Curated annotation (Swiss-Prot):
Ranges for region Disordered: 12-71
Localisation: Cytoplasm
Pfam families: B56
Biological processes, Gene Ontology terms: signal transduction
Biased composition (Low complexity): 23-34
SUBUNIT field: PP2A consists of a common heteromeric enzyme, composed of a catalytic subunit (subunits C), a constant regulatory subunit (subunit A), and a variety of regulatory subunits such as subunits B (the R2/B/PR55/B55, R3/B''/PR72/PR130/PR59 and R5/B'/B56 families).
Domain of life of the source: Eukaryota
Gene3D superfamilies: Leucine-rich Repeat Variant
Functional description taken from the UniProt entry: The B regulatory subunit may modulate substrate selectivity and catalytic activity, and may also direct the localization of the catalytic enzyme to a particular subcellular compartment.
Protein name according to UniProt: Serine/threonine protein phosphatase 2A 57 kDa regulatory subunit B' epsilon isoform
Gene name of the record: B'EPSILON
Residue ranges with Polar residues bias: 35-71
Protein source organism: Arabidopsis thaliana
């Protein structure tokens, strides 16, 4: 029965192939299998067609199996269900279905190709269920055709962001606030990603066999897709890549290195934040699995690739994931606390108050995991910066800095180094008490000042005495300066007369 179906299918294939070959000859100068509306850096699949193509067929990927059914252009047609054929016929039918799903449907208009779209959707759903079922045995040839179909669907040129077009964006337009571009053919693309995910996590798939298809090239092109503006696609990519990292141990160094290279490219070339948050989320789980003592390679990437991410203007998009990664490093190896804190101070924002609030929140998380021995190494530059934050005219910055004293672990570290810290921030607290415009900041400063007084009265009095002496000297210097200017003005008036 199945052989009859195959023969009938071949006849249809031959007729259709001749028809489409004639069309291809007539339109040879105008056809293309890449997206033409401006592409980004993602490498297109050699056999994929544009998302906006209105044809019902697509060129099949190269290196197709040497079977008669795969020598023709795939056509979307109804095939028997996998569960309705014998186990011996199932592999060939599976490959035919996978080959058929290499076609791309036109989603630019909902009225175009409704039947073909539904056939492909139902076929993809069946393949997903087949891999998920206990009977879903997939041999090496089937895996090859499956990954070829996945590649033909997901690897494509991505449309450029609005601000990347040659025309200048409207005045005041912020690329970070643009509405993301949503893939119109997501109903199919989602199922392809689900199929890939089922393949990767399947216990029936041996890594030694799958590495022939999930190789460095495949992983590299998968990483390129993190530049997609569609958040749904990036979420699937994050899950798939994380599963690949967990299952394919021999790919782990390559994946880590590739992620760091994307960070380098973002920092020094594109400054495009899309996908950085998802990559950092993957990296956070990776760091959590590092062994202690940490290898020098990981320390180097922390300094060269992760900490510099703090200097980006678009840090608010991925700061939560970045802070988690940084904190994970300190929790894994407490000796990295000094490196991390000095890195934060190096990239501390000077004019962006909202970014400064983010830094203070991250600093608290890092200090919460810092040991006293590491804290002592950076206490002076750290509290010099905190003192500046205490006196910030932006009340949110000043408040966030004062909230550090609500953390018991940080208060304990301060108490152990009070001889160094008190003189640094005492002046900042006094200035807030006397002249800060925000009442909440005024009250918080008073609470911290009282805490210092209770912690060490004698040291507090010494700092207060030193502060009053410095204020007196400053007043005296100001009077001398005013007197000097007055004398210069008088001398200038006499000379003019």
């Amino acid at each position: 029965m199945f052989n009859k179906i195959i023969k009938l299918g071949q006849k249809k294939f031959n007729k259709s192939d001749q028809h489409h070959q004639d069309n291809n000859n007539n339109n040879n100068n105008t056809s293309t299998n890449t997206v033409v509306r401006g592409s980004r850096t993602t490498t297109p699949a050699p056999s994929s067609v544009s998302n906006g193509e209105s044809q019902t067929t697509a060129q099949s990927p190269s290196q197709t199996p040497n079977h008669p059914m795969f020598t023709t252009t795939p056509i979307l047609e109804v095939l028997p269900l996998l569960k309705d054929v014998s186990s011996s016929d199932r592999p060939l039918l599976f490959m035919k279905k996978a080959h058929m799903c290499s076609c791309h449907c036109d989603f630019s208009d909902t009225l175009i190709m409704p039947r073909e779209k539904e056939i492909k959707r139902q076929t993809l759903l069946e393949l997903v269920d087949f891999l998920h079922s206990s009977s879903g045995k997939v041999n090496e040839t089937m895996q090859s055709e499956l990954i070829r179909m996945v590649s033909a669907n997901i690897f494509r040129c991505l449309p450029p962001a609005y601000h990347e077009n040659t025309g200048a964006p409207p005045e005041g337009n912020d690329p970070e606030e643009e509405e993301p571009y949503l893939e119109p053919w997501w109903p199919h693309l989602q199922l392809v990603y689900e199929l890939l995910l089922r393949y990767v996590v399947s216990s029936e798939i041996e890594p030694k066999t799958a590495k022939k298809f999930i190789n460095h090239t495949f992983v590299s092109r998968l990483l390129d897709l993190f530049d997609s503006e569609d958040p749904r696609e990036r979420e699937y990519l994050k899950t798939v890549l994380h599963r690949i990292y967990g299952k394919f141990i021999f790919h782990r160094p390559f994946i880590r290195c590739s992620i760091y290279n994307i960070f380098y490219k973002f920092l020094y070339e594109t400054e495009r934040c899309i996908g950085i948050g998802e990559l950092l989320e993957i990296l956070g789980s990776v760091i959590n699995g590092f062994t202690v003592p940490m290898r020098e390679e990981h320390r180097l990437y922390l300094v060269k690739a992760i900490l510099p991410l703090h200097k980006s203007k678009g840090i608010s998009i991925y700061h939560q994931q970045l802070a988690y990664c940084v904190t994970q490093f300190v929790e894994k190896d407490y000796k990295l606390a000094d490196t991390v804190i000095r890195g934060l101070l190096k990239f501390w924002p000077l004019t962006n108050c909202q970014k400064e609030v983010l830094f203070l929140g991250e600093l608290e998380e890092v200090l919460d995991a810092t040991e006293p021995s590491e804290f002592q190494q950076c206490v002076v530059p750290l509290f010099t910066q905190i003192g500046k934050c205490l006196n910030s005219a932006h009340f949110q910055v000043a408040e966030r800095a004062l909230f550090l004293w609500n953390n018991e672990h940080i208060v304990g570290l301060i108490a152990q180094n009070k001889d160094v810290i008190f003189p640094i921030i005492f002046e900042a607290l006094e200035r807030n008490m006397k002249g800060h415009w925000n009442q909440a900041v005024h009250g918080l400063s008073e609470n911290v000042r009282r805490m210092f007084l209770e912690m060490d009265t004698e040291l507090f009095e010494e700092c207060e005495k030193q502060y009053l002496e410095n204020e007196a000297k400053a007043c005296e210097l100001l009077e001398q300066r005013e007197l000097t200017w007055k004398r210069l003005e008088e001398a200038a008036s006499l000379a003019a007369n």
